[in-house]
Amino acid sequence: MIKVVNVEDREEGNKKAHDILKKLVENKTLLALSGGTSVDYRVTLGQNEIDPGAICVVDERFGKPFHQDSNELLLKNQGVKDFADRFCIESHKILKGKDFLETAKVYEKEIEDLFKKFKKKVGVMGIGVNLHTAGIFPYSVSAKSPNFVEAETVEDTFPKRITLTLKALGEFMNFVILAFGKEKKDSLKKVLDEKENDMQKNPAIFYRKSTIKSFLITDVLL
Protein backbone atom coordinates (compact mmCIF):
# COMPACT_ATOMS: atom_id res chain seq x y z
CA MET A 1 0.00 0.00 0.00
CA ILE A 2 1.76 3.13 -1.22
CA LYS A 3 0.96 6.79 -0.72
CA VAL A 4 2.91 8.97 -3.17
CA VAL A 5 4.23 12.22 -1.68
CA ASN A 6 5.42 14.63 -4.38
CA VAL A 7 8.16 17.14 -3.61
CA GLU A 8 10.27 19.59 -5.61
CA ASP A 9 13.68 18.06 -4.95
CA ARG A 10 15.84 15.87 -2.69
CA GLU A 11 16.19 18.57 -0.03
CA GLU A 12 12.44 19.03 0.33
CA GLY A 13 12.00 15.26 0.18
CA ASN A 14 14.27 14.66 3.16
CA LYS A 15 12.46 17.35 5.14
CA LYS A 16 9.16 15.64 4.32
CA ALA A 17 10.63 12.30 5.40
CA HIS A 18 11.59 13.91 8.70
CA ASP A 19 8.05 15.18 9.24
CA ILE A 20 6.56 11.75 8.52
CA LEU A 21 9.06 9.94 10.76
CA LYS A 22 8.22 12.31 13.63
CA LYS A 23 4.67 10.94 13.53
CA LEU A 24 5.62 7.28 13.06
CA VAL A 25 8.59 6.79 15.38
CA GLU A 26 8.61 6.74 19.19
CA ASN A 27 10.75 5.11 21.85
CA LYS A 28 9.26 1.67 21.33
CA THR A 29 10.06 1.68 17.60
CA LEU A 30 12.83 -0.16 15.79
CA LEU A 31 14.06 2.19 13.06
CA ALA A 32 15.82 0.47 10.14
CA LEU A 33 18.03 2.66 7.93
CA SER A 34 19.19 2.16 4.34
CA GLY A 35 22.13 3.71 2.51
CA GLY A 36 22.02 5.12 -1.00
CA THR A 37 22.12 8.58 -2.54
CA SER A 38 18.53 9.69 -1.88
CA VAL A 39 18.58 10.01 1.89
CA ASP A 40 20.34 12.65 3.99
CA TYR A 41 20.08 11.58 7.62
CA ARG A 42 21.29 14.94 8.88
CA VAL A 43 17.91 16.20 7.66
CA THR A 44 15.78 13.05 7.89
CA LEU A 45 16.60 12.36 11.54
CA GLY A 46 17.13 15.99 12.51
CA GLN A 47 18.48 16.96 15.91
CA ASN A 48 16.19 15.69 18.66
CA GLU A 49 12.61 15.23 17.44
CA ILE A 50 12.86 11.54 16.48
CA ASP A 51 13.49 9.10 19.33
CA PRO A 52 13.51 5.42 18.31
CA GLY A 53 14.09 2.60 20.76
CA ALA A 54 16.82 1.17 18.54
CA ILE A 55 18.40 1.66 15.12
CA CYS A 56 19.54 -1.07 12.73
CA VAL A 57 20.98 -1.16 9.21
CA VAL A 58 18.82 -2.60 6.42
CA ASP A 59 21.64 -3.90 4.22
CA GLU A 60 25.37 -3.71 3.72
CA ARG A 61 28.12 -4.04 1.13
CA PHE A 62 30.40 -6.68 2.63
CA GLY A 63 33.96 -5.85 3.62
CA LYS A 64 35.93 -4.62 6.61
CA PRO A 65 34.03 -2.54 9.18
CA PHE A 66 33.52 1.02 7.93
CA HIS A 67 35.13 0.35 4.54
CA GLN A 68 34.90 3.27 2.13
CA ASP A 69 31.86 1.96 0.21
CA SER A 70 29.91 0.72 3.23
CA ASN A 71 26.48 1.92 4.23
CA GLU A 72 27.61 2.11 7.85
CA LEU A 73 30.30 4.65 6.89
CA LEU A 74 27.72 6.68 4.97
CA LEU A 75 25.44 6.63 8.02
CA LYS A 76 28.31 7.60 10.31
CA ASN A 77 29.32 10.48 8.02
CA GLN A 78 25.72 11.71 8.02
CA GLY A 79 25.69 11.83 11.82
CA VAL A 80 23.69 8.70 12.64
CA LYS A 81 26.29 7.36 15.10
CA ASP A 82 26.55 10.72 16.86
CA PHE A 83 22.75 10.92 16.93
CA ALA A 84 22.49 7.47 18.55
CA ASP A 85 25.28 8.17 21.04
CA ARG A 86 23.90 11.57 22.03
CA PHE A 87 20.46 10.21 22.85
CA CYS A 88 21.62 6.80 24.16
CA ILE A 89 19.84 4.88 21.39
CA GLU A 90 21.04 1.33 20.89
CA SER A 91 22.32 0.79 17.36
CA HIS A 92 23.12 -2.34 15.37
CA LYS A 93 25.42 -2.41 12.36
CA ILE A 94 26.23 -5.41 10.17
CA LEU A 95 30.00 -5.52 9.63
CA LYS A 96 31.93 -6.98 12.56
CA GLY A 97 35.16 -8.23 11.00
CA LYS A 98 33.88 -11.79 10.49
CA ASP A 99 33.68 -13.73 7.23
CA PHE A 100 30.81 -13.30 4.76
CA LEU A 101 28.48 -16.09 5.89
CA GLU A 102 29.27 -15.74 9.59
CA THR A 103 28.49 -12.02 9.41
CA ALA A 104 25.02 -12.80 8.05
CA LYS A 105 24.46 -15.50 10.67
CA VAL A 106 25.33 -13.15 13.52
CA TYR A 107 23.14 -10.36 12.13
CA GLU A 108 20.24 -12.77 11.62
CA LYS A 109 20.30 -13.50 15.37
CA GLU A 110 20.43 -9.78 16.17
CA ILE A 111 17.45 -9.07 13.91
CA GLU A 112 15.45 -11.97 15.36
CA ASP A 113 16.04 -10.57 18.85
CA LEU A 114 15.16 -7.02 17.78
CA PHE A 115 11.97 -8.17 16.09
CA LYS A 116 10.92 -9.91 19.30
CA LYS A 117 11.72 -6.83 21.38
CA PHE A 118 10.08 -4.23 19.14
CA LYS A 119 6.56 -4.79 17.90
CA LYS A 120 6.65 -1.53 15.93
CA LYS A 121 9.18 -1.40 13.11
CA VAL A 122 9.68 1.45 10.62
CA GLY A 123 12.09 1.42 7.68
CA VAL A 124 13.72 4.20 5.65
CA MET A 125 14.18 2.69 2.21
CA GLY A 126 15.24 3.36 -1.36
CA ILE A 127 14.42 1.90 -4.77
CA GLY A 128 17.02 1.25 -7.47
CA VAL A 129 16.57 1.68 -11.21
CA ASN A 130 16.50 -2.13 -11.48
CA LEU A 131 13.79 -2.19 -8.80
CA HIS A 132 16.02 -3.57 -6.08
CA THR A 133 15.33 -2.40 -2.55
CA ALA A 134 17.65 -2.85 0.42
CA GLY A 135 20.06 -5.52 -0.85
CA ILE A 136 17.22 -7.47 -2.45
CA PHE A 137 18.04 -7.64 -6.15
CA PRO A 138 16.00 -9.16 -9.02
CA TYR A 139 15.88 -12.96 -8.82
CA SER A 140 17.96 -12.97 -5.64
CA VAL A 141 17.84 -15.45 -2.78
CA SER A 142 16.74 -12.68 -0.41
CA ALA A 143 13.55 -12.17 -2.44
CA LYS A 144 12.31 -15.65 -1.51
CA SER A 145 14.32 -16.68 1.55
CA PRO A 146 12.61 -18.06 4.68
CA ASN A 147 15.21 -16.21 6.77
CA PHE A 148 15.28 -12.62 7.98
CA VAL A 149 18.86 -12.02 6.73
CA GLU A 150 20.78 -13.36 3.74
CA ALA A 151 24.33 -13.11 2.42
CA GLU A 152 24.63 -13.46 -1.34
CA THR A 153 26.55 -12.30 -4.39
CA VAL A 154 24.45 -10.24 -6.81
CA GLU A 155 25.02 -8.53 -10.16
CA ASP A 156 26.13 -5.09 -9.06
CA THR A 157 29.18 -2.86 -8.71
CA PHE A 158 29.25 -4.07 -5.09
CA PRO A 159 28.27 -7.73 -5.49
CA LYS A 160 28.71 -9.16 -1.97
CA ARG A 161 25.65 -8.13 0.01
CA ILE A 162 24.14 -8.85 3.40
CA THR A 163 20.54 -7.75 3.65
CA LEU A 164 17.20 -8.02 5.32
CA THR A 165 14.97 -10.22 3.16
CA LEU A 166 11.45 -9.65 1.84
CA LYS A 167 10.30 -11.88 4.69
CA ALA A 168 11.93 -9.49 7.16
CA LEU A 169 10.38 -6.45 5.47
CA GLY A 170 7.01 -8.13 5.88
CA GLU A 171 7.38 -7.67 9.66
CA PHE A 172 7.38 -3.86 9.42
CA MET A 173 4.55 -1.45 10.19
CA ASN A 174 5.59 1.42 7.91
CA PHE A 175 8.16 2.40 5.30
CA VAL A 176 9.35 5.84 4.24
CA ILE A 177 10.80 5.45 0.73
CA LEU A 178 12.93 8.14 -0.91
CA ALA A 179 13.54 8.10 -4.67
CA PHE A 180 14.73 11.12 -6.64
CA GLY A 181 15.79 11.87 -10.20
CA LYS A 182 14.29 11.35 -13.64
CA GLU A 183 16.28 8.11 -14.05
CA LYS A 184 13.93 6.55 -11.47
CA LYS A 185 10.74 7.39 -13.38
CA ASP A 186 10.29 4.10 -15.27
CA SER A 187 11.13 2.07 -12.18
CA LEU A 188 8.66 3.94 -10.00
CA LYS A 189 5.95 3.58 -12.62
CA LYS A 190 6.48 -0.19 -12.48
CA VAL A 191 6.23 -0.13 -8.71
CA LEU A 192 2.80 1.49 -9.00
CA ASP A 193 1.59 -0.54 -12.00
CA GLU A 194 -1.12 -3.00 -10.92
CA LYS A 195 -0.13 -5.25 -13.85
CA GLU A 196 3.37 -5.78 -12.42
CA ASN A 197 3.15 -8.56 -9.85
CA ASP A 198 6.40 -10.54 -9.99
CA MET A 199 8.31 -9.71 -6.81
CA GLN A 200 11.15 -12.05 -7.76
CA LYS A 201 11.78 -10.01 -10.91
CA ASN A 202 10.95 -6.61 -9.38
CA PRO A 203 11.41 -6.79 -5.59
CA ALA A 204 10.37 -3.17 -4.96
CA ILE A 205 6.77 -3.85 -5.99
CA PHE A 206 6.58 -5.44 -2.53
CA TYR A 207 5.66 -1.98 -1.23
CA ARG A 208 2.56 -1.80 -3.42
CA LYS A 209 1.45 -5.39 -2.96
CA SER A 210 1.95 -5.40 0.81
CA THR A 211 -0.73 -4.20 3.24
CA ILE A 212 2.01 -2.27 5.05
CA LYS A 213 1.52 1.49 4.64
CA SER A 214 4.43 3.04 2.75
CA PHE A 215 5.12 6.66 1.88
CA LEU A 216 6.93 7.12 -1.45
CA ILE A 217 8.60 10.54 -1.43
CA THR A 218 9.74 11.57 -4.89
CA ASP A 219 10.36 14.52 -7.19
CA VAL A 220 9.20 12.42 -10.15
CA LEU A 221 5.71 13.05 -11.51
CA LEU A 222 4.00 9.67 -11.90
Language-model regions, residue ranges each:
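Glycine-rich beta-strand-to-loop/alpha-helix junction loops that act as flexible
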Residues: A32-S38, M125-V129, F180
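Ligand-binding beta-strand-loop-alpha-helix segment within the catalytic cores
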Residues: M1, D51-V124
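A short secondary-structure junction signal
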Residues: A104, T133-Y139, S187-V191
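ATP/nucleoside-binding phosphotransfer catalytic cores, i.e., glycine-rich phosphate-binding loops
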Residues: M173-L222
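Class I SAM-dependent methyltransferase SAM-binding "motif I" and its flanking Rossmann-like core
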Residues: G123-K167
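A glycine- and small-aliphatic-rich helix-loop capping segment at beta-alpha/alpha-beta transitions
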Residues: Y41-P52, P138-P146, E194
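N-terminal glycine-/serine-/threonine-rich phosphate-binding loop
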Residues: M1-L31, F118
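Glycine-rich N-terminal segment of FAD-binding domains in flavoprotein oxidoreductases
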Residues: N27-N48
